[in-house]
């Protein structure tokens, strides 16, 4: 097995060998990790462990990859706040209502509002944002907001090897994966 990408740590080599013994194809994990200098972000050196945050800034976390550019373009970052609802006027989003760090309700008017609160938080805010012009919740004329949620659960497996494999280094959840069992197949006993 030859993993010729930047995350070719020993644990990935062992997993690639196991996949190949079983006849499974494997791929390098798609990772938002830079392998060279990019702004304030340094290239990955596989120092690990990525799941606890990257001490070099190689991992594309929101604070390094998006906020600096957004704030340079005029975005304002309000921390320790919880959005309670999205405000609309005549079927147009005009801002948000939030609770600030002191527990006070604040209103922020904005020309643009980006809603990115994951599958559950986004639906929650859309439903909490019901108003006269959207009585069933914002963007919910179909009554489907908050329904048909689909999760992509994952499993974490830890292995013990006879030799040292640097298992703590590189991207979280190793650096290769296989989708041999991605498609539904009732003959395997599960869907």
Descriptions of predicted regions:
Residues 38-41, 88-94:
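A short, glycine/Asx- and small/polar-enriched loop/turn
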